[in-house]
Every structure is written in C-alpha cells, then in structure tokens.
C-alpha cells in the first residue's frame, strides 16, 4: 500500500488502523533546534480526541503520545522524529456482523476491490482515527512555522446547513464545535440532538486560515501552493470539496469584483485567498473544506455482501454524529504540513543575498 507519505522536504509518513495496536508516524526533514516535546503534540491531539463533545463517538481514547526519536532536551535534533499512540478502547466485537457486508458511504467496497482483503473493524486504515497521526505531525509542523512567524487556525463556519457568523474567530478554539459565533452554538447543539435521535448524521464546512505566510511559497506549475493544499485537505476521508479564497463564488463574480486591488500596504481585498499563480502573495491564506455527513447511521440500509447478494444492514458500534468538530484540528494540521514543506522548499531555492 503506497500513498502513506506527504511532502517532499518536510515529510510525514503515517501508520496504523482504528482497531490495531496503535497509530503513529515519522516526520523526516524537520530542521534541528526547533522547540518540541510531547506536551506540544498532546495539546493538538486533545483537540481531536473522541468523547469530548455532543457530536462525537463515546469511544474513550486518551490518545497519549510518545516521542520515540528525533528530540533531545526539548529540541529537535534534525533526525527523523517518530511518535506513537496506543489504541486502548477498541470494541471490535461491534463489527462482527459486517465482516462480509459493505457499508454504504464507507470504503469497504473499494478497499476490497483494490486489495482483495480488508480490516472491517472500525474501517481499518480508512477510519477517521487514522487522522490522529496527521494531527501529531501537524503539531510538529506548527512548531516549525511558529519559528518563522506563521500561524494556522481553523474553525467551523457551517454545520448541517446552518451557518455561523465570524463574530469571534479568536475564541473559536474554546467554544463547542470550534464555532466563531457564540450565538449559533445552541442551535447546533439542538440540531445534533435531533439528528442523533433520528439515527442520522450531519456534515458541514470548515474554514482554515494561515497568517504570517511570506510571499513566494509555492512551486508552479504542478506543485502550486493552492493545488497542494487542496490535495492535502482532500486526502482527509470526510472532505468532498475545497475552496480557496472566494472559491466557487468567484465563478459568479465579474473580473472587476474578483480582482484584489494592490495598494502600497498590500492587497485591498483578498478574494484570491492569499495565493496568486500558485504562489503565496503575503496575505492571509483562506481555505474552506466541505465535510460530508458521517456514513455510519443508525438506520437500516440497503447493501450487498462480498458475493454480490442483496442484504440489509444496521450498523452497530460507537460513531460520531458529525466529523465536526474533530476534523477541525485535522484540517489545520494538513495545512501546516504543506506550509512547512513549502517553506523549506522556498528557503532551499532562495537566491543568496550578498
């Protein structure tokens, strides 16, 4: 199985399955001298940990990270940084009934088509739990970016079709659902309770912003910054679409409206989302990701078994009602990983100053 590594200079390789012994990864290419310890990574992991909100699974995982290499006396050494998290609350018996059935909306059918075998326990490698390793790697990337004055944040702008106003983005991380709007939280919580009672699930939209990004990051033409960011976000299982800046709204605008006037202090507007020609322009990078509803619903569904015979399916187990809010730190991590890689690539290619 290939496709487990992201990046060219700052590289993350991940491993692990939902019901295996554990998950983890290796960061290769991180420069020496970056302040890092387990607490830095743990803070990010705690943001996506299950069981912390009304929309999340009741599976209780402490997600305690262990650094295995690449860090000494609180700083990176320039060697590969390996980390590992144990799985402790698996309940594989919940999945015995679906060993031969394909769950609609999941990767069961496609993994069987590709490999001829699959780990049906919780989705195996295709489980959302796989994103734990991305968040850990992203925490390391954020430590590198912080050294260069770059910060990444993410928050929910829509849940179940109900939008949030960007009233208090700075406080979103301390609010349920990572909401930038205190007034919408109660409506979202009510909707989650209603949908959960119906045995159904919800999708939404997450916005990611990166500030302090210098002009010049991105590698045209096939490794444009927006192309690689979209690639990274789309690699997250629940993401079905990505917008940059004005995104699809730009298709409804005139050029005179969509163009960002350039003034001595920078750009007057930011419809481009901080990227022009695949290269960062120094403005805030703005991304939005469309997150599909969790496919594990508590309703009878029509499917087939591995022999192609029709069957009915009712999914047991413990599942999220929505990937939001736990996907929010995942998308922040993926953005940070790409920016860290692009930053190192730009520094390698930069013309030496006399």
UniProtKB/Swiss-Prot annotation:
Pathway: Metabolic intermediate biosynthesis; chorismate biosynthesis; chorismate from D-erythrose 4-phosphate and phosphoenolpyruvate: step 7/7. GO terms for cellular component: cytosol. PROSITE patterns: CHORISMATE_SYNTHASE_1, CHORISMATE_SYNTHASE_2. SUPFAM superfamilies: Chorismate synthase, AroC. This is Chorismate synthase. GO terms for molecular function: chorismate synthase activity; FMN binding. Keywords: Amino-acid biosynthesis, Aromatic amino acid biosynthesis, FAD, Flavoprotein, FMN, Lyase, NADP. The gene is aroC. Belongs to the chorismate synthase family. Its cofactor is FMNH2. The lineage of its organism: Bacteria, Pseudomonadati, Thermodesulfobacteriota, Desulfovibrionia, Desulfovibrionales. InterPro entries: Chorismate_synth (IPR000453), Chorismate_synth_AroC_sf (IPR035904), Chorismate_synthase_CS (IPR020541). CDD domains: Chorismate_synthase. Reduced FMN (FMNH(2)). It holds the Pfam family Chorismate_synt. NADP(+) binds at residue 48. Homotetramer. It catalyses: 5-O-(1-carboxyvinyl)-3-phosphoshikimate = chorismate + phosphate. One of its GO terms (biological process) is amino acid biosynthetic process. It comes from the Bacteria. This reaction introduces a second double bond into the aromatic ring system. It is an enzyme of class 4 (lyase). Its EC number is 4.2.3.5.
């Amino acid at each position: 199985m290939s496709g487990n590594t992201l990046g060219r200079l700052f590289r993350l390789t991940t491993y692990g399955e939902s019901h295996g012994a554990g998950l983890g990864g290796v960061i290769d290419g991180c420069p020496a001298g970056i302040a890092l310890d387990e607490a830095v990574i743990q803070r990010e992991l705690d943001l996506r940990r299950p069981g912390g909100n009304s929309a999340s699974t009741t599976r209780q995982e402490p997600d305690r990270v262990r650094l295995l290499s690449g860090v000494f006396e609180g700083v990176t050494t320039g060697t590969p940084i390996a980390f590992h998290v144990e799985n402790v609350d698996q309940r594989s018996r919940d999945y015995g009934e679906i060993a031969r059935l394909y769950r609609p909306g999941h990767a069961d059918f496609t993994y069987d088509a590709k490999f001829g075998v699959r780990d049906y326990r919780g989705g195996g490698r295709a489980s959302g739990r796989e994103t734990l390793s991305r968040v850990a790697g992203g925490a390391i990337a954020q430590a590198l970016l912080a050294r260069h004055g770059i910060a990444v944040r993410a928050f929910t702008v829509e849940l179940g079709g109900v939008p949030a106003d960007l009233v208090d983005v700075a406080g979103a991380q301390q609010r349920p659902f990572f909401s930038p709007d205190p007034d919408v939280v109660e409506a979202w919580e009510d909707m989650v309770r209603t949908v959960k009672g119906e045995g159904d699930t919800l999708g939404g939209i997450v916005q990611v912003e990166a500030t302090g990004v210098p002009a010049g990051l991105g590698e045209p033409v096939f490794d444009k910054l927006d192309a690689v960011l979209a690639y990274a976000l789309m690699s997250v299982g629940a993401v079905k679409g990505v917008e940059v800046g004005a995104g699809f709204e730009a298709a409804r605008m005139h050029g005179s409206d969509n163009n960002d006037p350039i003034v001595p202090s920078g750009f007057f507007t930011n419809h481009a989302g901080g990227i022009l020609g695949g290269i960062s322009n120094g403005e805030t990078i703005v991304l939005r990701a469309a997150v599909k509803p969790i496919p594990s619903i508590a309703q009878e569904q029509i499917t087939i078994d591995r022999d192609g015979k029709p069957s009915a399916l009712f999914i047991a187990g413990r599942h999220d009602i929505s990937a939001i809010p736990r996907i929010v730190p995942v998308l922040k991590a993926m953005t940070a990983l790409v920016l860290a890689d692009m930053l190192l690539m730009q520094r390698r290619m930069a013309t030496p100053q006399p």
